[in-house]
Structures are given as C-alpha cells and as structure tokens.
C-alpha cells in the first residue's frame, strides 16, 4: 500500500470529502483522509494523508493556516460568502470609506479573539451540525470559540462600484478560524453589511500552494508510475516537537513500552535515523507510545 502526504490543490465546486473520494478512485486505495476542511467554494491547499500517514493527520490539522481572498462591503449573505442569498444591503460610495479606516479596523482583529461560527458550518450543537439547523430555518445558540489572528491586512486598493466596495486581503490564523465570519465581523466594525467574496488557502500544515498539485496532475503522475506527488510521512508531524531515539529506545517503543526522556512537551514525534517511528505522549516522568509507525 502506498503511504505519504499529498499537497492537494483543491479546486472550487468540490467538498473536501469529494476530493478524498476522487483520490481513492485514482490511487485505488480506501485509506485516505484530509486535514483541515475547505468549504466547496474555497480553493487551495488541502493536506491529504494516504496509507499509514492517516495515523498522523490529526497533527496536521493543529497547525496555523494562511489565506488570501476578497471581502465585499455593501451587502451580506445568508452563508457569509458569495454562495448565499442576499439578506441585507448597506450601499456605500468612495466618499464613505478610506483605506486608512479599513486598515485600522483590520489591525484591531489581530491577536487572540473570540469568534462565533456561522450558521452554515459543520460545528455541532446538541449532536447536530449547524448547517442542518440553518437549512430547516432554525436558529440556535452557537458556541463561542477562541482563535488567534497573527496577521490580517489589505493587499489591494479599495474598488468602488454600484454601491459596493471590494478589496483583497491576507490573513494568517490559527486552526478553527472562519475567515468568512472574520469578513462579516470586519464589516460590522466598519458599519457595513459584508461577506467574503473569494478565498484561497495558500498554506496549511507547512504545505504551500506553490508546490500543490491538482487532482488531474496527480492522476497523470500516477498513470506514469511517478509517485513524486507523495511526500514522506514526516510532513505530517512538522508542527510537533521532535526527539531522536537511541536504538534501545526504538526497541522498547516497538514493544509498546514506555521510555524515559528529558522533555517538557506533552506530545512528541519520535525519530530514529531521520524517520518518524512513533508519536509519544507524556505520562509522569515517562513517555508512552501513543501511535507506533514502524
């Protein structure tokens, strides 16, 4: 069975699950998962784990993400992105808003902030996904979540036309951030209805869009028995603290035994001869093998 990490460039119009389903058909294997869901309209980096690498995919979802996109001020939608129905309008012209005001407002969102996930999201409340409530017209109290915005800035001039204002942006954020909600909250701060009109994820789990491949490109490589699209499993633990093991430690780990290590981390990626062989978890003064990858 093939094993590794794929830096997939997801295209618009497909869910993250659709991408996994198509890769299973291309690679003729069922053991495939994704790290970090992308909405159907969002394009960009979707980390994929194949084979044994699926055992470390949970650690890929912990990392921060980088996005580039577009915010439109002037009207809001039911889904907070361009796919929803228009629910309110606040027309504006060039005399109503300056770039300095926008930049100042964007800067106020950096650091730890509280965010309420959108109704059209997969967050569960009482065992039911929020979008299921939304589709049936029900409004429920949504759990607040703590996120961190490392950087949020404008990357284009403000473009005004027919009562709306559009501009491009860059955001670096923690896992669990809803960028479309960030776009809506920015609009509220500026005093206008708004939504996220485009979004592209350019980096996730240490994978960059500059090296990502489309499904079509992966399919062509696989047909030619070119497996260069598969990155080593070690790419799945880039964000974990690492420790190099002795041969004696490796043997103990292979039997599922605990080992003594001087390390303050709660979770470690254990390496032997430059290969990740286990995920270790702290238990008192010892580390227990949580996942053995030998």
Curated annotation (Swiss-Prot):
Q: What class of enzyme is it?
A: isomerase
Q: Which GO terms describe its molecular function?
A: RNA binding; tRNA pseudouridine(55) synthase activity
Enzyme Commission number, as recorded = 5.4.99.25
Q: Which reactions fall under this protein's catalytic activity?
A: uridine(55) in tRNA = pseudouridine(55) in tRNA
Question: From which residue to which does any coiled coil extend?
Answer: none
Instruction: State the active site.
Output: 39
Q: Which keywords does the record carry?
A: Isomerase, tRNA processing
Which Cys residues form disulphide pairs? Answer: none
One Pfam annotation reads: TruB_N
**Its biological function?**
Responsible for synthesis of pseudouridine from uracil-55 in the psi GC loop of transfer RNAs.
| HAMAP family from the UniProt entry | TruB_bact (MF_01080)
Q: Which PANTHER family match?
A: PSEUDOURIDYLATE SYNTHASE TRUB1, TRNA-PSEUDOURIDINE SYNTHASE
What is the similarity comment for this entry? Answer: Belongs to the pseudouridine synthase TruB family. Type 1 subfamily.
Q: What is the recorded name of this protein? A: tRNA pseudouridine synthase B
Taxonomy-wise, where does this protein's organism fall, top ranks first?
A: Bacteria, Bacillati, Bacillota, Bacilli, Lactobacillales
